[in-house]
C-alpha cells in the first residue's frame, strides 16, 4: 500500500477539531452547530479532493496513491462525524457493554482504495441487538455523510449476525474478509475478525475459492467473455481490477496475508510475478482515476471517446503504423492478458496445495492412461512431473500443446505455470525442425486448431515462438469496424476456416464450403490465414510487408518452395477479392480482366475465395452477410469462367444476343411486340448487367407502364439469398433523378448497398437499387416500403426536399464522431474502358450518398452504377460515371474539379480536412487501398 505524502495538506484533522471546538463553544447546542459543522466538512473535503487531483494532474501521485489518499480523506471525515455524534450530539458518560459501537470500512474502501467518484461502504458493528443510542449515532453519521453528497453503502449488524450471514452469503463473506477497522470500539472489531476467521474462513477455503472463481466466470460471460472487447470495463471486465481483487481475496482468505508481496514468502508467487501483479494494479488504477476525473462520475468503461484523451494524458504518442491511442489500448490488453497469466499461476499453486478441485473434466480415452507422450494425466489434464522438464527440453512445451490437441485433453494449471516460468526457453527452439513440425501440425490439424492456437497465445508461447505474431498480440485498430485485436481475429479466422472445411458454414458460405474441398494446397491456405495480418501496425502496406514475412517464415514451418510462394501471394493479395467484389462493377468486362490478370489460376482463385470469406467472417459480428456472400460468389463465378476458357470480353455481341433470347423465352405470355419494344429500349451495356430473370421482370414493368400510362412506377422484390430488397424505378428520365431517389431512401431509412442506373433508348430511366434496413437485412416491412414509395413520389414531385429533412439528423452518433476519417477522392480511368470510376472515402453519415450523387449531378456527370460499402464509421462509395457525351472524363482540369467538389461534400462533415487524419488502415495508405471488408 503506497504511503501518503504530506497528509495534512490533504486534510488536517487536528486543525479541524480545533475549529469544531470553537464552533460549539459558548451556549450553542450541537444541533445549532450542525450547519456550521457541515460547512466545515464540505470545505475540508473540497480542499482535500482538489489537493489530490492537483497531485495527480501534476504527475506527483499515481492512480494507486490517489486511491489511498482519497480513502484517507474519507477516513478522517467519517471519524470527525462519529466523534461529534458520540461526544456532543448523543454523549454517554458511562456507556454500557451493549452500547459499544464500531465503524468498519468494507468493499474497496475496506482495502484502503477509493476512486474519485466511488461509493464508501460502511459496516456498523454491534455487540448485541441495536440500542436507541446506537441507532441515533448511526443515523446522525449517515445523514451527515449524505448531506456531504457522498454515496454511502451501509449495513448495521451484530457480531453474531455478521458471522451467520458470512457463512451463507459469499458477497457478505467477501465484504467481511476485506473489512478494515475505521473508528469506534477496536476490541469489538477485533472480536469480529477473530470469530470470522475461526468460525467461517478457516473451515471453508475450497468452497470460497470455487465460489469466487465461479463468480468471476459469470462476470466475464456477462461482459463479453473476452479481455479484448473494444470498450472494456476496467473494473469488472476480463483482465480488469476485479480479477486482481479476486486473487487478493483468495490469498487473504487462505493465507491470511494483507499484501501480495507476502505471497512470495509463502512460495505462491515469485518476486517477478509479484512485481507483475503490482505493475498491473498500478496501471489499472492510473487509468481508472483518469476515467473518473474525465467523466466527472463513477465511470469504469473505457469508451471510445475517452480512450484518446487518456492515451494523451499518459503520453502515448503516435508512431509509424500505430496511433497513440492504439499503443495505449495495446498496453491495456497486454496488462489484461498478464492478469490472466497470474490467475493461472495462482490457481496452479492452490491446486498443488489441494485448496481447490479441478474445474474441468473432459471425457477422453486419455483419462485411462497414467501417461501419454511422456506427460502425466491428472483428472483429464496433461501435466509434467517437474517444471524443469521444459527448461531441459524446450521442444516439450510445444509437444504438450500438440498432445493435448491430439488427445482432446485440457492442460493442467501446474504445467501452464511451469511454461510461464520457462518462457525464455522457447527462444532456443524457433529454428528447431521438430518444434516447427509440431507447430505446423497443430495449425493445420483437423482437431480444433482454433482452441489450440488460443491456448498457445494465452500462455504467451505463440508470440515467443513466432515473434512476428508477438508484435500483433493485443494490437487493435481504433475504429468501430475492427471488433477484435489482430491476434484474436487471426485465431478466430483459423477457426472459421476449419468450420468451412467441416461444413459448419454451408448455409452462410455455400461456395466456399464447396470450393474448399477442391483446394490442393491445404497447408498453404492455413498458413496464409495465419499470416494475412502479421504486418499490421508496422507502417506501410501490411499486405506487402506481410508477404515478405511469409517468405521468411514458411520455410521455417516446413513448407515447400511452391507452398511458400503461394502463401506469400495470398498474403500480398488477401484484400484483392473483397476490394474488387465490393467496390467494382463485376459486370464490367474490364473488372474481370484485371482481376484474372492478378489471380492467373483456378487454384489461386479458390484459395483466395476461402481466405477472403474466413477473413471477413472473423472481423466481427454481423460483418459477413448474404449480400457480401453474393457479390463474392458472382466475382468467383465470373473469374472461374474466364480462367477456364469460358466467354471472354471478345464475345460481347454474342452474349448480348444470348441475353435477349433468354429473356424472350421467359416472356411467352407477353405480346411479341412488347418483347421487341423492350429489346429496342436496351443499350448493349444493359443486356450485360442483369440475368435473364431480371430482364424479363423489367420487360413486364415497362409493358405495364405503357398499358396504364403511369409517369412513375416503383416495384420491389425481396432476395432472401442475397439479403437485400431490389427496388426498381421506371420513370421519365431527367437530371438528378438518381440523387433525388437516394435522398428519399435516406429519409426513409433504407440503406443503398448497390445501384444500377440506365437511361433507355426511349428516354425512360430504369433504375435499380438494392437496399437493406439498419440491421443489414432486407428492407421488406410493408409499412416501411409504403412510406418509401410515398417519399420517392413526393420527392420527385417536389413536395419533399430530402436535404432539409436530412439536416435535422445526420445519423452520426456521438461515439462515431470520436473517429476521424480522412476524406479522399480517387479517380481511375483504367478500371473500366467505358466509364470513369470515382471512389469516395470518408466518415459515413445519413444522406451521404444523396449529397455525393447531388454533387455528381451538378457536375453534369451521368451515373451508371454505384457500389456502397461501410466499415464501421467509414464509408467507401464507388461510382461509374460518364460525361454528357457518354465518354470517360479525361481532362485534368475537369478531374480536379470533380475531386474538389466531392472533397467539399466530405469535408463539411469531417473533423479533419482532407488527408489530415489517417483512415482506418495502415499509415500512409488510402482507405481505398486498406479499408476493406476483410481488413
Tell where the protein language model's regions lie, with residue ranges.
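Non-catalytic interface/linker regions that flank or bridge core catalytic/transmembrane domains
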Residues: 1-105, 112-114, 118-482, 551
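A short, contiguous, amphipathic alpha-helix enriched in charged residues
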Residues: 71-89, 93, 492-503, 736, ...
Amino acid at each position: 500500500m503506497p504511503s501518503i505524502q504530506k497528509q495534512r495538506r490533504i486534510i488536517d484533522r487536528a486543525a479541524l477539531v480545533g475549529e469544531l471546538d470553537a464552533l460549539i463553544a459558548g451556549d450553542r447546542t450541537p444541533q445549532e452547530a450542525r450547519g456550521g459543522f457541515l460547512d466545515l466538512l464540505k470545505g475540508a473535503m473540497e480542499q482535500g479532493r482538489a489537493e489530490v487531483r492537483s497531485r495527480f494532474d501534476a504527475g506527483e501521485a499515481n492512480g494507486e496513491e490517489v486511491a489511498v489518499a482519497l480513502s484517507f480523506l474519507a477516513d478522517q471525515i467519517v471519524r470527525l462525524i462519529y466523534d461529534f455524534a458520540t461526544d456532543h450530539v448523543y454523549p454517554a458518560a458511562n456507556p454500557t457493554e451493549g452500547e459499544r459501537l464500531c465503524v468498519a470500512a468494507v468493499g474497496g474502501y475496506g482495502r484502503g482504495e477509493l476512486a474519485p467518484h466511488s461509493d464508501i461502504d460502511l459496516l456498523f458493528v454491534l455487540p448485541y441487538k441495536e440500542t436507541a443510542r446506537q441507532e441515533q449515532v448511526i443515523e446522525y453519521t449517515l445523514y451527515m455523510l449524505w448531506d456531504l453528497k457522498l454515496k454511502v453503502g451501509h449495513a448495521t449488524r451484530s457480531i453474531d449476525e455478521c458471522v451467520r450471514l458470512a457463512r451463507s452469503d459469499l458477497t457478505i463473506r467477501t465484504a467481511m474478509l476485506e473489512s478494515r477497522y475505521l473508528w469506534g470500539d477496536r476490541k469489538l472489531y477485533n472480536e469480529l475478525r477473530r470469530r470470522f476467521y475461526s468460525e467461517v474462513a478457516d473451515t471453508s477455503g475450497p468452497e470460497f475459492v470455487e465460489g469466487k472463481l465461479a463468480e468471476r466466470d459469470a462476470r466475464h460471460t456477462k461482459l463479453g467473455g473476452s479481455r479484448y472487447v473494444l470498450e472494456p470495463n476496467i473494473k469488472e471486465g476480463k483482465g480488469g481490477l476485479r480479477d486482481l481483487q479476486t486473487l487478493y481475496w483468495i490469498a487473504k482468505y487462505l493465507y491470511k496475508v494483507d499484501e501480495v508481496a507476502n505471497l512470495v514468502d509463502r512460495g505462491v508467487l515469485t518476486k517477478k510475478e509479484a512485481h507483475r501483479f503490482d505493475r498491473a494494479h498500478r496501471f489499472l488504477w492510473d487509468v481508472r482515476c483518469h476515467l473518473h476525473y474525465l467523466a466527472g462520475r463513477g465511470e469504469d468503461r473505457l469508451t471510445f471517446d475517452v480512450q484518446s484523451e487518456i492515451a494523451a494524458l499518459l503520453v502515448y504518442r503516435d508512431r509509424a503504423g500505430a496511433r497513440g491511442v492504439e499503443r495505449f489500448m495495446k498496453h491495456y490488453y497486454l496488462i489484461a492478458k498478464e492478469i490472466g497469466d497470474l490467475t493461472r499461476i495462482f490457481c496452479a499453486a492452490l491446486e498443488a496445495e489441494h485448496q481447490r478441485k479441478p474445474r474441468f473434466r473432459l471425457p477422453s480415452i486419455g483419462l485411462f492412461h497414467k501417461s501419454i507422450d511422456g506427460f502425466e494425466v491428472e483428472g483429464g489434464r496433461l501435466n509434467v512431473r517437474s517444471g524443469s522438464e521444459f527448461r531441459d527440453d524446450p521442444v516439450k512445451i510445444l509437444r504438450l500443446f500438440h498432445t493435448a490437441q491430439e488427445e482432446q485433453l485440457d492442460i493442467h494449471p501446474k504445467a501452464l505455470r511451469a511454461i510461464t516460468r520457462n518462457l525464455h526457453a522457447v527462444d532456443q527452439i524457433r529454428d528447431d525442425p521438430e518444434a516447427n513440425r509440431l507447430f505446423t501440425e497443430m495449425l493445420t490439424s483437423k482437431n480444433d486448431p482454433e482452441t489450440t492456437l488460443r491456448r498457445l497465445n494465452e500462455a504467451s508461447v505463440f508470440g515467443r515462438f513466432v515473434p512476428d505474431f508477438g508484435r500483433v498480440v493485443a494490437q487493435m485498430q481504433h475504429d468501430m469496424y475492427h471488433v477484435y485485436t489482430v491476434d484474436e481475429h487471426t485465431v478466430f479466422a483459423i477457426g472459421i476456416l476449419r468450420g468451412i472445411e467441416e461444413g459448419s458454414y454451408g448455409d452462410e458460405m455455400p461456395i466456399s464450403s464447396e470450393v474448399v474441398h477442391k483446394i490442393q494446397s491445404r497447408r498453404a491456405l492455413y498458413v496464409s490465414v495465419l499470416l494475412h495480418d502479421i504486418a499490421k501496425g508496422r507502417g506501410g502496406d501490411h499486405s506487402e510487408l506481410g508477404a515478405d514475412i511469409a517468405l521468411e517464415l514458411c520455410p521455417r514451418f516446413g513448407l515447400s518452395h511452391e507452398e511458400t510462394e503461394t502463401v506469400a501471394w495470398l498474403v500480398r493479395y488477401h484484400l484483392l477479392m473483397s476490394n474488387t467484389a465490393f467496390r467494382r462493377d463485376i459486370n464490367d468486362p474490364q473488372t474481370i480482366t484485371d482481376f484474372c490478370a492478378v489471380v492467373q489460376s483456378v487454384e489461386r482463385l479458390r484459395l483466395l475465395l476461402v481466405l477472403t470469406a474466413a477473413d471477413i467472417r472473423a472481423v466481427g459480428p454481423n460483418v459477413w452477410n448474404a449480400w457480401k456472400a453474393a457479390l463474392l460468389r458472382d466475382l468467383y463465378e465470373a473469374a472461374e469462367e474466364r480462367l477456364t476458357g469460358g466467354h471472354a470480353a471478345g464475345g460481347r455481341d454474342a452474349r448480348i444476343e444470348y441475353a435477349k433470347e433468354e429473356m424472350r423465352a421467359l416472356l411467352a405470355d407477353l405480346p411479341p411486340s412488347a418483347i421487341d419494344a423492350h429489346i429496342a429500349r436496351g443499350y448493349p451495356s444493359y443486356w450485360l448487367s442483369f440475368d435473364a430473370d431480371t430482364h424479363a421482370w423489367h420487360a413486364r414493368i415497362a409493358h405495364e407502364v405503357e398499358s396504364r400510362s403511369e409517369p412513375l412506377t416503383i416495384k420491389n422484390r425481396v432476395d432472401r439469398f442475397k439479403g437485400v430488397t431490389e427496388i426498381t424505378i421506371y420513370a421519365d428520365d431527367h437530371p438528378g433523378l438518381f440523387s433525388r431517389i437516394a435522398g428519399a431512401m435516406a429519409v426513409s431509412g433504407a440503406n443503398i448497398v448497390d445501384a444500377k442506373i440506365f437511361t433507355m433508348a426511349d428516354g425512360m430511366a430504369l433504375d435499380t437499387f438494392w437496399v437493406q434496413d439498419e440491421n443489414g437485412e432486407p428492407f421488406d416491412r410493408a409499412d416501411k416500403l409504403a412510406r418509401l414509395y410515398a417519399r420517392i413520389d413526393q420527392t420527385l414531385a417536389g413536395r419533399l426536399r430530402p436535404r432539409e429533412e436530412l439536416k435535422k439528423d445526420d445519423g452520426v452518433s456521438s461515439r462515431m464522431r470520436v473517429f476521424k476519417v480522412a476524406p479522399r477522392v480517387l479517380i481511375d480511368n483504367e478500371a473500366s474502358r467505358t466509364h470513369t470510376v470515382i471512389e469516395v472515402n470518408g466518415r459515413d453519415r445519413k444522406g451521404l450518398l444523396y449529397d455525393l450523387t447531388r454533387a455528381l449531378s451538378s457536375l453534369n456527370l451521368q451515373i451508371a452504377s454505384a457500389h456502397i460499402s461501410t466499415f464501421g464509421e467509414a464509408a467507401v462509395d464507388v461510382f461509374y460515371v460518364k460525361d454528357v457525351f457518354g465518354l470517360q472524363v479525361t481532362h485534368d482540369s475537369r478531374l480536379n474539379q470533380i475531386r474538389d467538389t466531392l472533397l467539399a461534400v466530405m469535408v463539411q462533415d469531417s473533423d479533419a480536412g482532407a488527408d489530415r487524419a489517417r483512415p482506418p488502415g495502415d499509415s500512409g495508405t488510402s482507405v481505398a487501398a486498406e479499408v476493406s471488408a476483410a481488413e
